Amino acid sequence: MKSLTELFGCFKRQPRQQEASSPANPHVSDTLSMGVAASGMPPPKRPAPAESPTLPGETLVDAPGIPLKEALKEAANSKIVIFYNSSDEEKQLVEFETYLNSLKEPADAEKPLEIPEIKKLQVSRASQKVIQYLTLHTSWPLMYIKGNAVGGLKELKALKQDYLKEWLRDHTYDLIVIGGGSGGLAAAKEASRLGKKVACLDFVKPSPQGTSWGLGGTCVNVGCIPKKLMHQASLLGHSIHDAKKYGWKLPEGKVEHQWNHLRDSVQDHIASLNWGYRVQLREKTVTYINSYGEFTGPFEISATNKKKKVEKLTADRFLISTGLRPKYPEIPGVKEYTITSDDLFQLPYSPGKTLCVGASYVSLECAGFLHGFGFDVTVMVRSILLRGFDQDMAERIRKHMIAYGMKFEAGVPTRIEQIDEKTDEKAGKYRVFWPKKNEETGEMQEVSEEYNTILMAIGREAVTDDVGLTTIGVERAKSKKVLGRREQSTTIPWVYAIGDVLEGTPELTPVAIQAGRVLMRRIFDGANELTEYDQIPTTVFTPLEYGCCGLSEEDAMMKYGKDNIIIYHNVFNPLEYTISERMDKDHCYLKMICLRNEEEKVVGFHILTPNAGEVTQGFGIALKLAAKKADFDRLIGIHPTVAENFTTLTLEKKEGDEELQASGCUG
């Protein structure tokens, strides 16, 4: 990738500074899509600008005009700033000033509006490119109001005058965060650290089954944290069976899992995290309000608590970080008789025979650990598994889960009927109906099966309908997610969004956390850094974990052409599985996707193995640094580990090849 020097031609470096890099196309918007888990989202189909313009320790020689760093600081800390290049633009500057002065109100008005000082800052054309790249505004001269990029005169005039007048007044808070998930909390604490007055609103509407939870969002309460703990509990069950092969003498009798004990342990841990977040907010002097926030004006929020008491709050800026909630299909009986991942981890009874509906990572992960506890589990899918992920890897996961003892049904439920009602001590019993092709006649016929628990995991949707975004004109996509110019609303410049609720953004907890912190530094401290939304390592915590980073086979071929892609792969056998004779050993697999005409630059890697997340995280940095296959070849592996297989790949994947067989230690 090109460096910023190559891209903008404006920087002179002090000696021995690290070379930074920039996106291949700085004009491509990174705007927008388990709030969710640090696992399970495919790499984005259209990567955002990949590299931050931040150059640590950089000296910017930028004349004429003030240095870029100073200019951005002024924009962040002044009420009104206009950036321009030359005296040729002075006429436009006068037009800005004239328009703003037209908003003045008479001195005898109830709250007379005074127009603050308008700072006109001259910057070089090179700095102009950087500022426009940071804001994704093409207009010039470019105006900032209270640290928010507005755009040019056209964009300024497009704002309602009443909104603009109110924007220039003082408000109670510098920032109100709506949503107390991982991203919202990170942003609130970072803004407070930068000296801003911050409030954070968080309120969880109960699921149709009545489940709610505390501060921390999806990941902590009903996503990655409880999911990973239950995944680990499932793996421990297999380790107990393996222990005999390793010489451990176990008590006679059947080893059984106790659902209630695990559930209570998981919920105790979550409760400690909920309390910890409240303590952190207090220590950071962030005002925590356990109320549901809704816009009632451009700079006003109505905060309604569980007692229906309403409090009005005002702020200069707002951050939407409300995340996602599970979707429910319009099928008779679904909302009455099914649960989602919102309910599973607090389920008061043992799930029993379970149907997981959906091909998402949530469905497969939950199916995996429930089967590991000894439950009869079926996964019902409409079409392909793990849409958006590498489909070769998805098929390998399906084959492993079938070998593991799970069942797969192709279809979609048409209705669900209750047979026995559930209680707090016992699961109910339900009959699920769906159409299935008769193998003898070829005709579709209705079939049914009884289950104790039905888990719906068909996808998630943004929590934006009841936040009042339409009241103030925040533009949303068809997905209900906020459309943004980076994290800034495309239509209301004092409203921002991060995390799962931002269109086009990977739905991953670490992404939301980093986006929140980086955004706060940019708008409150003038930092010239951006969140990098590409080449994000991720893991699906199925029984045999799937880790990946970069492009799938399908996306690599679509982007670069089939003839320019070379794929190295192998099947391997973890040493730990040899003595225990695990069936998993024939399913462990990895591959590396490279570009033929770019010295075999690595554009994606995928691995199906125990502890795939730990392996993927480490190798992810190689893609960020544009590593080539030869770099992996030169790296000496740690023996015996599964990770060392990335350093010994020699087999090229070709169409028509027979399935690989694992052999020897670690491959």
Swiss-Prot record:
<dbReference type="GO" id="GO:0005737">
    <property type="term" value="C:cytoplasm"/>
</dbReference>
<keyword id="KW-0274">FAD</keyword>
<dbReference type="GO" id="GO:0045454">
    <property type="term" value="P:cell redox homeostasis"/>
</dbReference>
<dbReference type="InterPro" id="IPR036188">
    <property type="entry name" value="FAD/NAD-bd_sf"/>
</dbReference>
<feature type="cross-link" description="Cysteinyl-selenocysteine (Cys-Sec)">
    <location>
        <begin position="665"/>
        <end position="666"/>
    </location>
</feature>
<dbReference type="GO" id="GO:0042395">
    <property type="term" value="P:ecdysis, collagen and cuticulin-based cuticle"/>
</dbReference>
<comment type="similarity">
    <text>Belongs to the class-I pyridine nucleotide-disulfide oxidoreductase family.</text>
</comment>
<dbReference type="GO" id="GO:0005829">
    <property type="term" value="C:cytosol"/>
</dbReference>
<keyword id="KW-1015">Disulfide bond</keyword>
<dbReference type="InterPro" id="IPR023753">
    <property type="entry name" value="FAD/NAD-binding_dom"/>
</dbReference>
<keyword id="KW-0560">Oxidoreductase</keyword>
<dbReference type="Pfam" id="PF07992">
    <property type="entry name" value="Pyr_redox_2"/>
</dbReference>
<protein>
    <recommendedName>
        <fullName>Thioredoxin reductase 1</fullName>
        <ecNumber>1.8.1.9</ecNumber>
    </recommendedName>
</protein>
<dbReference type="InterPro" id="IPR006338">
    <property type="entry name" value="Thioredoxin/glutathione_Rdtase"/>
</dbReference>
<keyword id="KW-0676">Redox-active center</keyword>
<keyword id="KW-0963">Cytoplasm</keyword>
<keyword id="KW-0285">Flavoprotein</keyword>
<dbReference type="GO" id="GO:0004791">
    <property type="term" value="F:thioredoxin-disulfide reductase (NADPH) activity"/>
</dbReference>
<comment type="subunit">
    <text>Homodimer.</text>
</comment>
<feature type="compositionally biased region" description="Polar residues">
    <location>
        <begin position="17"/>
        <end position="32"/>
    </location>
</feature>
<keyword id="KW-0521">NADP</keyword>
<feature type="active site" description="Proton acceptor">
    <location>
        <position position="639"/>
    </location>
</feature>
<dbReference type="GO" id="GO:0050660">
    <property type="term" value="F:flavin adenine dinucleotide binding"/>
</dbReference>
<dbReference type="InterPro" id="IPR004099">
    <property type="entry name" value="Pyr_nucl-diS_OxRdtase_dimer"/>
</dbReference>
<feature type="binding site">
    <location>
        <begin position="202"/>
        <end position="219"/>
    </location>
    <ligand>
        <name>FAD</name>
    </ligand>
</feature>
<dbReference type="InterPro" id="IPR016156">
    <property type="entry name" value="FAD/NAD-linked_Rdtase_dimer_sf"/>
</dbReference>
<keyword id="KW-0712">Selenocysteine</keyword>
<comment type="function">
    <text>Together with glutathione reductase gsr-1, required for the reduction of disulfide groups in the cuticle during molting.</text>
</comment>
<dbReference type="InterPro" id="IPR046952">
    <property type="entry name" value="GSHR/TRXR-like"/>
</dbReference>
<feature type="region of interest" description="Disordered">
    <location>
        <begin position="1"/>
        <end position="57"/>
    </location>
</feature>
<dbReference type="GO" id="GO:0005739">
    <property type="term" value="C:mitochondrion"/>
</dbReference>
<feature type="disulfide bond" description="Redox-active">
    <location>
        <begin position="219"/>
        <end position="224"/>
    </location>
</feature>
<dbReference type="Pfam" id="PF02852">
    <property type="entry name" value="Pyr_redox_dim"/>
</dbReference>
<dbReference type="InterPro" id="IPR012999">
    <property type="entry name" value="Pyr_OxRdtase_I_AS"/>
</dbReference>
